[in-house]
């Protein structure tokens, strides 16, 4: 049994807000909360990808249209640059690190560059080469962001012992490659 526990608007800062649905799945005495974000009018470059998920208790699959990896990365990289030192979303940093390291063989840098440009256009942001480097340098030098990372690391078991320096090395190298070159 599924129960929607909360629906709220997300991405209100953009012209195309979406919604986040908090859902609780119940099976006998098991309870599993999860969330689904639904947005419209995003710049998905080159297009949505169909993912098939096999159901646990039925012999069938369901299909979900979703972002491709390049668009997901482009949106997170744009957010990292746009928010700079004001970014409190450590999950964005973690996601970029994890995707770039675990799925690098599935990522097309040509598509990623196009997705980044499309995301910036959609979000009405632009970043010059000098601005990109300055923003990344400020992020690297900021002890407040490092402390937020350390807190994020402590409360999220999946982060393991990943250091802020390791995360930044991946982020800086990849953002510079797609946003500067």
Task: Please describe what each predicted stretch is.
Residues 1-181:
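Structured mid-to-C-terminal alpha-helical surface segments
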């Amino acid at each position: 049994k599924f129960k929607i526990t909360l629906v709220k608007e997300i991405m209100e800062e953009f012209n195309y807000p979406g919604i986040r649905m908090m859902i609780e799945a119940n099976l006998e005495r098991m309870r599993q909360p999860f969330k689904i974000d639904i947005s419209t009018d995003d710049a998905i470059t080159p297009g949505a990808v169909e993912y098939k998920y096999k159901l646990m208790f039925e012999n069938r699959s369901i299909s979900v249209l979703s972002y491709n990896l390049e668009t997901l990365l482009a949106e997170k990289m744009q957010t990292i640059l746009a928010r700079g030192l004001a970014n409190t979303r450590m999950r964005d940093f973690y996601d970029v690190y994890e995707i770039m390291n675990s799925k690098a063989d599935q990522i097309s840098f040509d598509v990623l560059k196009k997705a980044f440009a499309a995301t910036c256009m959609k979000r009405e942001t632009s970043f010059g080469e000098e601005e990109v480097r300055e923003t990344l340098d400020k992020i690297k030098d900021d002890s407040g962001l490092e402390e937020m990372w350390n807190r994020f690391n402590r409360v999220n078991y999946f982060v393991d012992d990943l250091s802020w320096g390791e995360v930044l090395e991946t982020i800086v190298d990849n953002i510079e490659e797609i946003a500067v070159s």
